[in-house]
């Protein structure tokens, strides 16, 4: 289970009064927690490729976003692919590799199909209400300050749909003998 973009606002990392994270805090007590994990590159795509391959961006030659890793590294075995190759179910729910937000919400983006046993691409009302995104450069969402004050419940948003699906999958996996 990997989560990103949390900053140190979660309770288990010191917290912030506005962030209520009891479930993440409980998970952190039971699992591994990386407190000195640093970004390998100041862009999303190279950092994510580095995390999944174990290679520095200068080794992989992935220095920009919107790169399919197999074009640069056709024979690389990613972390999730290694688990999959050793009998684990490696399921991706939402974004792991780079994709443009909000444009690519609900599709594979720049994913690596060889890395996964199963995938799920959630698409919530935050995608269908894309026109409501405020951006300092209208219509440009990456590389500029932009946000959406989304209406609706958590379960209607892309992240809420992903969290609900993850819970369902974890319950399903717990009933099998296959590691996940």
Residue ranges and their predicted role:
Residues 1-180:
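Formylglycine-dependent sulfatase
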